[in-house]
């Protein structure tokens, strides 16, 4: 009888122990560093992996066709971040990402992780630049002059060149 009770007790412990929910563990020091580097407050509801990965790319120089921390272009940056954070492969060209990987999203409906597309003024229906929307009208992208940087959709240049938002 004692063996039977012991068996029941062990079974209950194993069963009840496996029912608990697991909350993801975050390295809060890493989040704090990302918050400082990005100059943004990162909340509990935010996608922490997106902000940490974005901070890791900040300052990487621009290189046409690049997709590494030695040099990256705009679509290479979005591809690399999406692969790491969302485990999703994106096309390697801004216009292909817009047409093949995304459904259109209005500027006022952008959510964290959406792609933001811009034209160069010559071909107003062709995406020539892409970034990833973070929050508060800020997005990360690879600038030809400044490398990987954070910009605001409210800046005159980006307002003028806005094409669309996209949700992969």
Locations of regions flagged by a protein language model:
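Extracytoplasmic/secreted envelope proteins and their assembly/folding machinery
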Residues: 47-51, 55, 75-79, 110, ...
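Aromatic- and glycine-rich peptidoglycan recognition patches
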Residues: 20-42, 46, 104-106, 126-128, ...
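Catalytic cysteine-centered active-site loop
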Residues: 37-38, 60-112
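C-terminal motif of bacterial Sec signal peptides marking the signal peptidase cleavage site
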Residues: 14-18
């Amino acid at each position: 009888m004692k063996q039977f009770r012991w068996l029941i007790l062990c079974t209950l412990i194993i069963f009840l122990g496996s029912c608990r929910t697991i909350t993801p563990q975050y390295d809060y020091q890493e989040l704090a560093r990302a918050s400082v580097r990005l100059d943004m407050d990162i909340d509990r509801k935010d996608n922490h992996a997106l902000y940490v990965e974005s901070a890791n790319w900040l300052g990487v120089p621009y290189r046409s066709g690049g997709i590494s921390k030695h040099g990256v272009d705009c679509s290479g940056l979005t591809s690399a971040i999406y692969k790491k954070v969302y485990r999703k492969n994106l096309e390697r060209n801004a216009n292909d990402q817009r047409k093949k990987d995304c459904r259109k999203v209005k500027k006022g409906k952008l959510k964290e992780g959406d792609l933001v597309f811009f034209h160069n003024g010559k071909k107003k229906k062709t995406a020539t630049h892409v970034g990833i929307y973070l929050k508060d009208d800020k997005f990360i992208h690879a600038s030809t002059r400044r490398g990987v940087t954070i910009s605001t959709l409210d800046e005159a240049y980006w307002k003028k060149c806005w094409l669309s938002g996209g949700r992969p």
